[in-house]
Amino acid sequence: MKHVYGWLLLTPAAILLIGFTHYPAAATLLDSLFSTGTAVRPSRFVGLENYAALAADPIFWQVLGNNFWFALGTIPTSIALAMLMAIWVNDRLPARALVRMAYFTPTVLPMIAVANIWLFFYTPQIGLLDQIGAKFGVASHNWLGDPHTVLACTMAMVIWKEAGFFMIFYLAALQSLAPELEEAARIEGASRWYFFRRVTFPLLMPTTLFVLVNATINSFKLVDHLFILTKGGPDNASSLLLYYIYQVAFSFFDTAYASTLTVVLLLLLASLALLQFQLVEKRVHYR
């Protein structure tokens, strides 16, 4: 009877998981094996032709490279900044609640609103960056129109938004640590850096693994800002994989190829998550 009761408790969650996760993933995989149907030409089975087209698509490789550099720039920076902010606001400092709120505020703002705020920074001539640069005689620069700077500009905005969110997890982890550890280290004459390196950081590894996985997923799913800032330009210099999927599906109406791109994205995220668990799991628990 207990066995049946357990399955009954599990059933609602299992139905939702299958309906909103497993079934869409399986349907997407199936769609990637067919051509895009039209009113005069029905969809037909093409096997791996869509994947062959993907391998020969230069835009796919460009946006995949963009996403790689975007992840490489945003993930470690936002995690390191979040950890530093959490350590600082965990100390006894004046107006600590106000500082915490200030750090967390970007997180609760919609990405579209954040993009509009940063658009004011980057707008040529009238933007904040150019206004400050003009005070020092620096020429105006089209930050979002230059292929060499546009991706870095979007990275800075995402780091500003994401760091406060990750800070909350690190702050909760820091507050769960026993204060006796720091007291004992102080009595033994350990420096703050030594205590952080040998005690605090190892104890934060479970939180770091959680944050790392979430940051990796976010680096591939956060594309709302592109609709406001660049629309993937110039010349796909700021386009990311998920935004390219959106363009293929809803601008070019090639749903089969969009499904192929989605399958690649799912496999990529699953592989990265497994790799992170395999590499980081060994250092998660402090002995």
Regions found by a protein language model. Give the residues of each.
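A structural signal for multi-pass alpha-helical bundles of membrane permease subunits
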Residues: 2-287
